[in-house]
Amino acid sequence: MSLPPLTLYLAAPRGFCAGVDRAIKIVEMALEKWGAPVYVRHEIVHNKYVVDGLRAKGAVFVKELDDCPDDRPVIFSAHGVPKAVPAEATRREMVYVDATCPLVSKVHIEAERHHAGGLQMVMIGHAGHPETVGTMGQLPDGEVILVETVADVATITPRDPDKLAFITQTTLSVDDTADIVAALQARFPAIVGPHKEDICYATTNRQGAVKAMAPKADAMLVIGAPNSSNSKRLVEVGRSAGCAYAQLVQRAEDIDWRALEGISSIGITAGASAPEVLVNEVIEAFRTRFDLTVEQVETAQENVEFKVPRVLREPAGA
């Protein structure tokens, strides 16, 4: 029996970004240097496959520093941590490595700079997301006002409307954030913004590729974790760019094949913490059911790389 034809559009860029790549390397190098167990505060990146792989090598994932012994190394996740966390690790004389993405650290520095200049911060982000918690935790309580939607902008009550600056989570929807920024600027004309957009290159590029791919595809799958902010945004971007059926799947076994009956094209992308091995697994699952033609939809090229901290580049005992 011949298989039905299907065009599979593959978004590029997709998958791992430089910050995720660096964070995973940090855990692997820490295990090489210090042996197991190495403790990691929160999931190093939001992807079950990656976390399970590191756990098998000897990484122990915990919620808080209280769950770590004093005498084993601890790594802080790529999302960033409140200032109180490294301060506590230092007090306990722990060996720690900060795997915060450098582009998240840039937002932290920005927040501190504006705070030092007497400005109150408005953060555009998702409540409870580790990155938002970490960024807001760079400043004293009450110094950062969280805004999640355009509607929130109308309800906030800053100390002084003329002394405000805004920052954003790095993994937001580019379009939604632009709407919130416009609302902030309309209500608070004096508000100061970042020199360069806080939403990172990888988030922007992956959303750009989805926008180019979505109108061509009958359906779209985003490979990513349900707790991955940037992956969930890719689903939303796909839907708003004209693809009626856009779904998040962790891996091939999650695909709802009945929902895909009768399609002649599908778009595939992956969130910034999803490894390429899971993309290949999904493509192979389609290959067993369809006569597949794969077309890459490339909208940008990436060559960003971040160095790991010096402590991991030095031999043990150095």
From Swiss-Prot:
Which residues does the annotation say bind isopentenyl diphosphate?
H46, H79, H129, S228, S229, N230, S273
Tell me, what does this protein do in biology?
Answer: Catalyzes the conversion of 1-hydroxy-2-methyl-2-(E)-butenyl 4-diphosphate (HMBPP) into a mixture of isopentenyl diphosphate (IPP) and dimethylallyl diphosphate (DMAPP). Acts in the terminal step of the DOXP/MEP pathway for isoprenoid precursor biosynthesis.
- EC assignment: 1.17.7.4
Kindly tell me the pathway this chain contributes to. Answer: Isoprenoid biosynthesis; dimethylallyl diphosphate biosynthesis; dimethylallyl diphosphate from (2E)-4-hydroxy-3-methylbutenyl diphosphate: step 1/1; Isoprenoid biosynthesis; isopentenyl diphosphate biosynthesis via DXP pathway; isopentenyl diphosphate from 1-deoxy-D-xylulose 5-phosphate: step 6/6
Q: Name one GO biological process term.
A: terpenoid biosynthetic process
Free-text remark on how the cofactor is bound: Binds 1 [4Fe-4S] cluster per subunit.
Query: Which family does the record assign?
Result: Belongs to the IspH family.
List positions binding [4Fe-4S] cluster. C17, C101, C200
Residues at the catalytic site: E131
* Keyword Membrane set for record: no
One of the entry's Gene Ontology molecular-function terms is: 4-hydroxy-3-methylbut-2-enyl diphosphate reductase activity
Q: Which cofactor does it need?
A: [4Fe-4S] cluster
Can you name this protein?
A: 4-hydroxy-3-methylbut-2-enyl diphosphate reductase
Pfam families per record: LYTB (PF02401)
All disulfide bonds of the chain are none
Which reaction is recorded as catalysed by this protein? Answer: isopentenyl diphosphate + 2 oxidized [2Fe-2S]-[ferredoxin] + H2O = (2E)-4-hydroxy-3-methylbut-2-enyl diphosphate + 2 reduced [2Fe-2S]-[ferredoxin] + 2 H(+); dimethylallyl diphosphate + 2 oxidized [2Fe-2S]-[ferredoxin] + H2O = (2E)-4-hydroxy-3-methylbut-2-enyl diphosphate + 2 reduced [2Fe-2S]-[ferredoxin] + 2 H(+)
Source organism (scientific name)? Dinoroseobacter shibae (strain DSM 16493 / NCIMB 14021 / DFL 12)
Key words of the record: 4Fe-4S, Iron, Iron-sulfur, Isoprene biosynthesis, Metal-binding, Oxidoreductase
Record: residues binding dimethylallyl diphosphate: H46, H79, H129, S228, S229, N230, S273
Q: Where does (2E)-4-hydroxy-3-methylbut-2-enyl diphosphate bind?
A: H46, H79, H129, T170, S228, S229, N230, S273
User: Which NCBIfam families does the UniProt record give?
Assistant: ispH_lytB, PRK01045.1-2, PRK01045.1-4
Q: Kindly report, in one word, the top-level EC class recorded for this enzyme.
A: oxidoreductase
